[in-house]
């Protein structure tokens, strides 16, 4: 038995914990890097440059979601064939996905480069930072194939149980990016262009390293394979397309929520933004557990170990409960101190009220997010994508509708009141679909289980 197969052999709780921890650490490290990157640009170039880079964030997040969603489709099938020890089909999926998504990333990169100016104008970017934002975005799109490759291969690594390698590559990429930022922005004085170029170089090196390391891992599995298989591509797309739609739609939805918050003024926005950062940090834990569940489920599904899937799901719920209790205790006892980290002494009473109210409300209900993510992870792992997409769209619809309809009339509180309701509705729909589909479909071949 290969040591890579611990997801189908070790105790479910142990396997998921060992598998998920590098993913959680990697996500936290990414957050630390993002803050460091912003600090460097803001300190050495100025607030206008920081605003220009920040103005690109919403748009780049949509394209990142496309890369992540595409990786999900390939990752689920790689996990399944790995669990079944069908290495020929596994390597065919790897080759087919890399060829297909490389072509897609080049097309998207060319599109983004050519239409950067139009997209930033559509987002109503302020005129004084428009040119700097367009410059940053164009350099970003030049490196988009490397970003795509890195994200696809990170998913591939986790699909075969190798979650530590993406963590190492992420740490390397982040540290390299920070040093390149300092050199190009602070040392060479290249401004926004330097920040974008530093990101391009770091992602390029990480993407190539990912490819080389992954190919070396694939040599362990001796088997013949096809370089490209149209049927397997269709199977991937049945899983990838709902994931892309779900992730990109959520990013767009959060842009709309931001537009609802803006009219409440700078201090309300500051309080909301502070808690959004806290929400993002705690969310990383539950998202990482859900992402760990998918390859665990898919590998065991491929190995026909259905009972282990149930035990793994229950283990994920236990992990979610533990982290939800931890989050509640931290927020309930330290919410004022946490708010002050972002708001400082200049924060007004309104800013602290908004931040504290939103944060404590989330603390009560993070368990809903946890069980939603775990259940969604099982659905993805089994390839049951239609109810997964519906559940996530209902979640987003609840959050958006309450914010758009009630917040302008009755206050900013309604922006976050619906958040746990959306999580709970998402969980109930996903869980109902899981109970309905599991007994009838558990032995069907992968390509029958998409949209």
Model-derived segments and spans:
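Helix-terminus/linker motif at the lipid-water interface of multi-pass membrane proteins
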Residues: 28, 32-50, 120-127, 183-190, ...
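Short alpha-helical transmembrane segments in multi-pass integral membrane proteins
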Residues: 1-20, 78-143, 187-241, 297-364, ...
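Interfacial/gating helices of multi-pass transporter permease domains
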Residues: 18, 41-61, 127-132, 192-193, ...
């Amino acid at each position: 038995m290969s040591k890579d197969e611990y997801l189908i052999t070790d105790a479910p709780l142990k396997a998921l914990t060992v598998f998920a921890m590098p993913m959680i650490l990697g996500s936290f490290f990414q957050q630390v890097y993002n803050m460091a990157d912003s600090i460097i640009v803001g300190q050495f170039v100025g607030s206008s440059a920081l605003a220009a880079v920040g103005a690109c964030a919403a748009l780049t997040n949509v394209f990142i979601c496309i890369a992540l969603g595409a990786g999900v489709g390939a990752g689920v099938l790689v996990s399944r064939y790995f669990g079944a020890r069908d290495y020929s089909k596994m390597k065919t999926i790897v080759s087919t996905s890399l060829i297909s998504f490389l072509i897609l990333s080049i097309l998207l990169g060319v599109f983004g480069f050519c239409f950067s100016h139009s997209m930033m104008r559509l987002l109503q970017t302020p005129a004084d930072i428009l040119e700097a934002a367009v410059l940053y975005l164009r350099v970003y799109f030049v490196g988009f194939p490397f970003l795509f490759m890195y994200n696809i291969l990170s998913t591939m690594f986790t699909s075969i149980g190798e979650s530590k390698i993406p963590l190492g590559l992420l740490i390397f990429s982040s540290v390299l990016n920070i040093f390149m930022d300092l050199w190009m922005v602070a040392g060479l004085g290249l401004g926004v262009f330097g920040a974008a170029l530093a990101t391009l170089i770091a992602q390029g090196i990480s993407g190539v390293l990912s490819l080389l390391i992954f190919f070396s891992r694939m040599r362990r599995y001796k088997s013949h394979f096809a370089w490209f298989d149209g049927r397997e591509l269709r199977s991937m797309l049945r899983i990838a397309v709902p994931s892309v739609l779900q992730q990109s739609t959520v990013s767009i939805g959060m842009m709309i929520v931001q537009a609802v918050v803006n009219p409440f003024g700078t201090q309300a926005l500051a309080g909301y933004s502070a808690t959004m950062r806290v929400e993002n940090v705690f969310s990383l834990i539950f998202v990482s557990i859900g992402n760990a569940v998918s390859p665990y489920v898919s590998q065991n599904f491929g190995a026909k170990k259905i009972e282990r899937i149930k035990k793994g799901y229950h283990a994920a719920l236990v992990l979610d409960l533990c982290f939800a209790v931890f989050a509640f205790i931290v927020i309930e006892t330290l919410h004022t101190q946490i708010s002050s980290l972002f708001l400082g002494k200049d924060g007004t009473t309104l800013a602290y009220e908004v931040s504290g109210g939103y944060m404590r409300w989330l603390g009560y209900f993070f368990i809903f997010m946890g069980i939603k993510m775990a259940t969604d992870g099982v659905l993805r792992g089994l390839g049951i994508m239609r109810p997964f997409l519906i559940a996530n769209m209902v979640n987003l619809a609840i959050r958006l509708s309450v914010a758009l309809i009630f917040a302008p009339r009755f206050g900013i509180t309604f922006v976050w009141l619906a958040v746990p309701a959306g999580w709970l509705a998402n969980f109930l729909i996903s869980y109902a679909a899981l109970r309905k589909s599991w007994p009838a479909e558990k032995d069907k071949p992968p390509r029958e289980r998409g949209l």
